[in-house]
């Protein structure tokens, strides 16, 4: 399946085949593909908690207002946006740029200063927005990769973030933009036609808003 077909055929699935496992090798392949996502200064501020154990999914379901798909999906991925990724990853990023010829050694301090000026302190709003924006790019690529690998997904915004952090040992300074249920469409389910989409004429402007 090519990328355009995967995008066109991806749907947010509410009815997953229960009890059907996704091999860890396939999950890892999906995550490796998603990890090719672009990110600001290549800082990659995403982390993922994979929840497959039935008992752990029950707990996550409670944090997600008892939505059945959390328990029925083969796995649920907790998307974690890390505002502290700049400090964690900047040295490796700059080393890579220098080794591969993207940056001359004398420009290192300049790039360090640029990232500090652009993203401010770790607990700032700018830094939180940076983390969520880039983690969302990763999440979208993950869903396209999943479709290409024969899996179905559903991104979820309906959950108690503090509950998820507490139950899954996620540090308080991290942000959870979404959960993504991953699995297989339940046998016998026929999806309804894709819901309303606006015409691009309604939301696309050229040259100015």
Task: List the model feature ranges, each with a label.
Residues 1-209:
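Acidic, surface-exposed loops and disordered segments
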